[in-house]
Amino acid sequence: MLFRSDKKTGKTVWKKDRPEKPYQPLTVIGRKAYVTPLIMNVKGRDLLISNGAAVCNAYDPETGEEIWSLTGGAESTIAMPFTEKGIVYYYTGFMVDPAGTDYSDLMAINPEGKGDITATNVLWKKRSGRLQLLTPVIKDGLIYTVDSNNNMMCIEATTGKEVWTTRMRSNFNASPVVAAGNIYFFSVRGDVVVIKPGREMQIVNQFQIQNPVWATPAFLRNSIILRTDRYLCKIN
């Protein structure tokens, strides 16, 4: 279910049941999504983009009317949809191929249209290791992300082509952050990797903070505020 509440009174403005049919074959845990919706303006109209395990939907945030849907994915997902230059990007829920390998698709879609846009509005999709945890970032037309196989990747936002990939030492579940002209990544083993955006992989700095990081950090002026499994830390 999706619903809108009045922020001053807490009263429900509208409620909308999400589609049930695409989720019927899935396990109970597989039907779940932990995704923060995205609101974007498309040709003068606001759309609320909400991707789930098996379907991505767009709604009118004023009324709750479903504008379009796009089917794809098979299990739970977490990453938030994101946008650049009028294109919506999101991870599907993870799937399993005939060989038993987990994977997800990174989707790029045209958010214009109405109804079922599965066959018409996909600009590109890129298969990779399970990609449903962290939300990628876009900088100067390039997408930066890390998959569940520890592959840090740079991808062209317009084509989906891989620009470079580098195998890292551990998993990255916190979302990367663009700050001070660089991109910061935080791993589950406490690695902090700072890279320079661009078509070549260039590490500016890296260090370890001893404790795992799962939550996306906040940046305050010249400091990083982050939560590990044991501490709330401020790093200058």
Regions found by a protein language model. Give the residues of each.
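Blade-level signature of beta-propeller repeat domains, shared across WD40, Kelch, NHL, RCC1
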Residues: I87-V88, G190-D191, P197, N211-N236
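Loop/turn-rich, solvent-exposed surfaces of beta-rich toroidal or solenoidal domains
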Residues: V96-D97, K126-P197
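Short, small-residue-biased leader/transition segments that mark boundaries at the very start
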Residues: M1-L2
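Beta-strand initiation motifs
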Residues: T9-V13, T63-W68, G113-V122, T159-V163, ...
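Extracytoplasmic beta-rich repeat domains
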Residues: K15-R45, N51, S69-E84, Y90-Y103, ...
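Short loop/turn segments immediately following beta-strands, especially the blade-tip
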Residues: L106-I117, A157, V194-E200, N236
